[in-house]
């Protein structure tokens, strides 16, 4: 049959409560020794592992940010260098253009001066030839007028005299 202390609804006794409390305390001590400490060790290892993974991820992120900043710096420096090269090329091109223009102007001035010199020389040659022709024609006309032939010396003196008068008239 049933024993009275096992029946539901039986009376509560202090001994049963003390025994239950003592058994529960022993169970807690055993759980703490054999289950809780290993479980806490595993949890602590897991926490440390997750912490180290987070630290590694943060370090990787910091390295990635540093690398990104370095790449941005290198890219900016390359942009500045390329802009400087472009500006230098523009300035060099402008200087070369100015030098070419100066050289062309000097050459045109030189050609112009040569042309002026050539024109002046040709003018002098033409005037000289014209004077000689005028002198010869004058002598020829004069000799026909006076109907006598002049010798070479008289002709030369007459031409020289006529040329000097012609030069004085101008």
UniProtKB/Swiss-Prot annotation:
Coiled coil: none annotated. It is a single-pass membrane protein. F(1)F(0) ATP synthase produces ATP from ADP in the presence of a proton or sodium gradient. F-type ATPases consist of two structural domains, F(1) containing the extramembraneous catalytic core and F(0) containing the membrane proton channel, linked together by a central stalk and a peripheral stalk. During catalysis, ATP synthesis in the catalytic domain of F(1) is coupled via a rotary mechanism of the central stalk subunits to proton translocation. Disulfide bonds: none annotated. This is ATP synthase subunit b. One of its GO terms (cellular component) is proton-transporting ATP synthase complex. It comes from Listeria welshimeri serovar 6b (strain ATCC 35897 / DSM 20650 / CCUG 15529 / CIP 8149 / NCTC 11857 / SLCC 5334 / V8). One of its GO terms (molecular function) is proton-transporting ATPase activity, rotational mechanism. F-type ATPases have 2 components, F(1) - the catalytic core - and F(0) - the membrane proton channel. F(1) has five subunits: alpha(3), beta(3), gamma(1), delta(1), epsilon(1). F(0) has three main subunits: a(1), b(2) and c(10-14). The alpha and beta chains form an alternating ring which encloses part of the gamma chain. F(1) is attached to F(0) by a central stalk formed by the gamma and epsilon chains, while a peripheral stalk is formed by the delta and b chains. Keywords: ATP synthesis, Cell membrane, CF(0), Hydrogen ion transport, Ion transport, Membrane, Transmembrane, Transmembrane helix, Transport. The chain crosses the membrane at residues 11-31. Pfam families: ATP-synt_B. Its main location: membrane. The keyword Magnesium does not apply. It is found in: Cell membrane. Belongs to the ATPase B chain family. InterPro entries: ATP_synth_B-like_membr_sf (IPR028987), ATP_synth_b/b'su_bac/chlpt (IPR002146), ATP_synth_F0_bsu_bac (IPR005864), ATP_synthase_B_chain (IPR050059). Signal peptide: none annotated. The gene is atpF.
């Amino acid at each position: 049959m049933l024993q009275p202390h096992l029946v539901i609804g039986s009376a509560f006794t202090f001994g049963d409560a003390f025994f239950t409390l003592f058994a529960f305390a022993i169970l807690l001590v055993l759980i703490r020794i054999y289950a809780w400490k290993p479980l806490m060790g595993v949890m602590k290892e897991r926490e440390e592992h997750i912490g180290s993974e987070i630290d590694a991820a943060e370090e990787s992120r910091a390295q990635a940010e540093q690398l990104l900043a370095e790449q941005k710096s290198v890219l900016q420096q390359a942009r500045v260098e390329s802009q400087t090269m472009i500006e230098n090329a523009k300035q060099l091109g402008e200087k070369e253009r100015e030098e070419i223009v100066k050289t062309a102007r000097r050459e045109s001035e030189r050609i112009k001066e040569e042309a002026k010199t050539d024109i002046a020389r040709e003018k002098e040659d033409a005037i000289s030839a014209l004077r000689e022709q005028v002198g010869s024609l004058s002598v020829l006309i004069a000799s026909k007028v006076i109907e006598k032939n002049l010798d070479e010396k008289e002709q030369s003196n007459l031409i020289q005299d006529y040329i000097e008068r012609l030069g004085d008239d101008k």
